[in-house]
Design a protein with these regions (language model features):
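Short, well-ordered alpha-helix to beta-strand connector turns
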Residues: 73, 104-105, 255
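Active-site/ligand-binding neighborhood in enzyme catalytic cores
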Residues: 1-85
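Nucleotide-sugar-dependent glycosyltransferase donor-binding/catalytic pocket residues
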Residues: 58, 135, 266
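A structural signal for the hydrophobic beta-strands that form the central parallel beta-sheet
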Residues: 77-79, 109, 260
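Short, surface-exposed acidic
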Residues: 1, 128-132, 217-225
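Mid-domain catalytic core of redox enzymes
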Residues: 81-215, 249, 295
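Conserved flavin/dinucleotide-binding core of flavoenzymes
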Residues: 169-298
């Protein structure tokens, strides 16, 4: 479990809420009294997988989805327009931006917890404190392009603590997403978290190359390297996280028409984040419908 906890959350399993961070493992352990036994029975029940792929994305990356959504919505989307402030105004919400103020009947804050806390601080101190109490660990990725084919199998690996490597894991991108890599090249992505993720881009690239060289002796000279750092990249689901989320939802009752969505609530994976967004949208629509019904009854 430790490599999984480090690769996904950048932390140690002793610090995490298993029920919040890995609900499937929690369910397996509770049902079968053993993670190993539960995994074996679950695999046996699924049988063999026929055809298809374990992974799905867009040919141009996930940015293709947001770009297409913005194009479809047209002028209703204000791109490159940060929200500088938020305040309740007689049952509605005023959003302050560099382009002026906007008035809305409902607001969904689909932003990281630290930024959401900053917007809520003037009028929701309890929710602000709960959001600030969700720790975020720094994360970084390093992409390395090599000429030729590297001697790797599968789609990557997670690194166990004590192996002497600084990276938390590696993805063989040319095998996982073959359409994104030019023919004749291999592409590897390394993942870092914690203090290592705070290093400079040059230092991160050096560490990634050193770790990869230990795993793959005779590594060819890197053709190109990119490093990306995310100072508050990953929320950590510490023990008591689900209770914190429940208290956060109760605190938002004082702010009708305001809803939260994001990876710091009930899952960091894309499926969980999509569900979080849908849940917030459904609640916002229900709030708007209630307002319309109330107005019609006057």
């Amino acid at each position: 479990v430790a490599p999984l906890a480090g690769g996904v959350y950048g932390g140690e399993p002793d610090d995490l809420s298993m029920r919040a961070a890995f609900p499937q493992l929690w369910e397996l352990e509770g049902r079968h009294r053993s993670l190993l036994l539960g995994a074996m029975r679950a695999r046996k029940g699924r049988g063999s997988r026929e055809g298809g792929s374990l992974f799905f994305s867009f040919a141009e990356g996930l940015q293709a989805l947001t770009r297409r959504m913005a194009e479809a919505l047209g002028e209703r989307v204000l791109r490159g327009t940060p929200v500088l402030g938020l305040e309740p105004v007689r049952g509605r919400w005023r959003l302050h931006t560099p382009k002026g103020a906007l008035l809305a009947e409902a607001v969904v804050l689909a932003i990281p917890a630290p930024q959401a806390a900053g917007l809520l601080r003037p009028f929701l101190p309890e929710a602000t404190a709960l959001l600030k109490g969700i720790p975020h660990t720094p994360a970084a990725t390093v992409s390395l392009a090599f000429p030729g084919a590297l001697p790797v199998e599968g789609h990557g690996l997670l690194v166990a603590k004590g192996e002497g490597l600084r990276a938390r894991g590696f993805t063989w991108t040319h095998r996982k997403w073959p359409g994104r890599v030019p023919e004749g090249f291999s592409l590897v992505r390394a993942y870092f978290s914690g203090e290592a993720a705070r290093l400079s881009e040059e230092a991160l690239i050096r560490l990634a190359l050193e770790d990869l060289a230990r795993l793959l002796p005779g590594l060819p000279r890197v053709h190109r390297a990119w490093a990306f750092r995310f100072p508050e990249g990953m929320p950590a689901y510490r023990v008591g996280h689900l209770d914190r989320v429940e208290r956060l939802e109760m605190a938002l009752v004082k702010a009708p028409g305001l809803f939260l969505a994001g990876n710091y609530l009930q899952g960091v994976g894309l499926p969980e984040v999509v569900r979080s967004g849908r849940r917030a949208a459904q609640r916002a629509l229900a709030h708007l419908s209630l307002g319309e019904a109330h107005g019609a009854s006057r």
